[in-house]
Amino acid sequence: MGMRMMFTLFLLAVLSTTVVSFTLDRASNGRDAAADSKAADQIAQTVRDECCSNPSCAQTHPEICRRTLMLQNPLNHDMSPSA
């Protein structure tokens, strides 16, 4: 086997390793993004619940609590929009 053939096989091995590593990394990033999104949703829900249970926070941020109430009771059409 000549030097040129050995070098070609070496490049082929490096390229295939890079491709496999790149695709595996992208697949794991997709799973991480989904987990991050779920964690962010849980954090937002906790902050929303704590704010809406505190009258001064609920008064300061009515857009958050109004949205929470509408999600809990979507048939309630009597809610006035916040100014």
Curated annotation (Swiss-Prot):
Summary of the tissues where the protein is detected: Expressed by the venom duct.
Sequence segments annotated as region (Ser-Xaa-Pro motif, crucial for potent interaction with nAChR): 53-55
Keywords for this protein: Acetylcholine receptor inhibiting toxin, Disulfide bond, Ion channel impairing toxin, Neurotoxin, Postsynaptic neurotoxin, Secreted, Signal, Toxin
Subcellular location: Secreted
GO molecular function, one term: toxin activity
Signal peptide start-end: 1-21
Keyword check for Signal: yes
Propeptide segments, given as residue ranges: 22-48, 66-83
Disulfide topology: 51-57, 52-65
Record bears the keyword Secreted: yes
A Pfam family hit: Toxin_8
GO terms under cellular component: extracellular region; host cell postsynaptic membrane
Something else known: Negative results: shows no or weak inhibitory activity on a range of nAChRs subtypes, including human and rat alpha-9-alpha-10, mouse alpha-1-beta-1-delta-epsilon, rat alpha-7, rat alpha-6/alpha-3-beta-2-beta-3, rat alpha-3-beta-4, rat alpha-4-beta-2, and rat alpha-9-alpha-10.
Function: Alpha-conotoxins bind to the nicotinic acetylcholine receptors (nAChR) and inhibit them. A synthetic amidated version of this toxin potently and preferentially antagonizes neuronal rat alpha-3-beta-2 (IC(50)=55.7 nM) and alpha-6/alpha-3-beta-4 (IC(50)=90.69 nM) nAChRs.
Similarity remark: Belongs to the conotoxin A superfamily.
Domain notes: The cysteine framework is I (CC-C-C). Alpha4/7 pattern.
Name under which the protein is recorded: Alpha-conotoxin QcIA
UniProt organism field: Conus quercinus
